Amino acid sequence: MEKKILFPQIGGIMHGGDYNPEQWLDRPDILEEDIRMMKKAGMNCATLGVFSWSTYEPREGEFHFAWLHDIMDKLYANGSYTILATPSGARPAWLDETYPECRRVDSYGVREHHGVRHNHCMSAPVYRKKVSVIVNKLADEFGNHPGLLMWHISNEFGGECYCPHCVKRFQDYLAEKFDHDIEKLNKAWWTTFWSHTYNDFSQIEPPYRNGEFSIMGLNLEWKRFTTWNMTDYMKAEIAILKERTPQIPVTTNFMKEYDGLDYHKMQQPLDVVSWDSYPRFHNDEESFSDTMTENAFDHAMIRCLKKEQPFMLMESAPGLVNWHPFNKMKRPGVHRLASLQAVALGSDTVQYFQWRKGRGSFEQYHGAVVDHLGTDDTRVFREVADLGEELKKLKDLAGTVVKAPVAVLYDWDSLWATDGMKGLAESTRNYIKTCRKAYRNLSALGVDVDVISSEEDYSGYSVIVAPMLYLLHTHVGERMKQFVEQGGHLIATYVTGYVDENQLNYLGGFPGDGLKDLFGVISEEIDTLYPSDRNCVHFAEMPEGEVRDYAEVLRVADGTNVLGTYEQDYYKGMAAVTERTCQNGSAMYIAARLDDASMQHLYARTLKKAVSYTHLTLP
């Protein structure tokens, strides 16, 4: 079993969470009790300083770190390490008052007021300067502390800014990308439509809601720029810490399959990837099993950002959250189940937000290990403590690297392009849900599944599943062809390969970029079904399948096997599912959105050829 130990100091699985002692500095009795109860809960790490800027620096240039020295010393003396965050996720009032350009401008061009969090401009030079000051101070004060285990960069990056600084950086970003050739950009974005041709990069604005949002290429590049700009900002923080403390690893906490940032790009400067997991347990829209499988998809997606090592579950709620539409309490045993699921899928940590509930403000009712009751005599605390003991017994799992023979392709570019397209049906495109469904149906067959980018290396996988890969980068088609020629098995679905990286349609038939030859099909039409519409697919070797939402009408090339045909409408009798073999590999095309049972049968058909698993649960 391959291993890579992230934190040898821990000697096992990390167990901890966000701790906010700055909220309790006037209650030394509570701070002392925290140390006692952390030991009782089996915690060996605490995340500090996430939102501590106004405590560190209550007035510009006036710094207070003695309280944090005291806390870190006591934690370390009691066997607990510290993950120390840079506090740039939320700004003190003096900063916004003195430097208003730090505040974001929204998509209508309006400057936001001071308040809440995660609403700072990543481009503002003065903001970057003030962040560099506090980050340097933290490195000076705590870089050599024996209890410092890791740096946590800011918190849950997200959002967009449309201020003049960001507009100028966007224009410069585009000029660099398109070789300072405005005609190259015009061609890539098809700007002659509606007479939107640009004469100079200085004319380009972001997609304001009260401005230009009709150019698909512009909208897509704005999303990419936002990822680039935030990553550039994050790298500036990391550079300071790496110069001062090169031995200390860095991370930041990602959020589910957050649609605002491309984590495949953003993970690159990090040493370890981590994320915050908050499933909607016990909701009335899906089964408990589906909730767990969706969470497993998220774990796999995060894990595969750095497949060669474990990831970190940076935040989870031991009880409930306070921001879901309905904040239902985890039932007994569910916290243990969800935590062990994370470990089984490759996490070397189980961590919480938060250790102790605050008395006021936005997250006063967010779940915590220690409730407002303030004791260790609660169900939640007992479950956390029991889990702490169990994690100690699982210490040998630390460092385990998960290897999967099957991968589902998930691309932020395809997500953004699919969400932003004007076509099909907005309510049923559902790119993320379609990828999750593929993961769920493969997992139901008992196979381990990765979730990777289409631009990653496919070697090591036997089966690649590409659900609705609407945007196909021009080099990916050739890589898919090589994968199949080398014995791999590729499965793609409807709405694959319609546009290139600029969101221009491929010409000559879909799927584009050579995939029509690989699959031996051309999608001539796509029928968008109303929610009440149904069709069926007849299979010779499996039960009839139900079709909802989308059905492509295919032209099938010679040498392509038809596995299923439509039973209704004007395309009755025409191909709905096909397969084409190539040496020892195969390429299956599923032209309609089929029910789960049918998808599992089709996946099983390929898995039987591709994966040597004695424990597969195949229909």
Walk through the language-model features, giving the residues of each.
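Carbohydrate-binding surfaces of carbohydrate-active enzymes
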Residues: F201-I204, K235, Q247, Y278-F281, ...
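Aromatic-lined substrate-binding rim segments of carbohydrate-active enzymes
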Residues: E32-K39, T47-D106, E237-R244
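The substrate-binding groove and active-site-proximal loops of carbohydrate-active enzymes
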Residues: H15-L25, S52-A66, H113-K130, F157-E160, ...
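Short, well-ordered coil/turn segments that N-cap beta-strands
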Residues: G11-I13, G42-N44, N78-T82, N144-L149, ...
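Short, acidic/polar
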Residues: W24-M38, K256-Y263, R331-S339
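N-terminal carbohydrate-binding accessory modules
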Residues: M1-C45, L397
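Polysaccharide-binding and catalytic clefts of secreted carbohydrate-active enzymes
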Residues: G109-F297
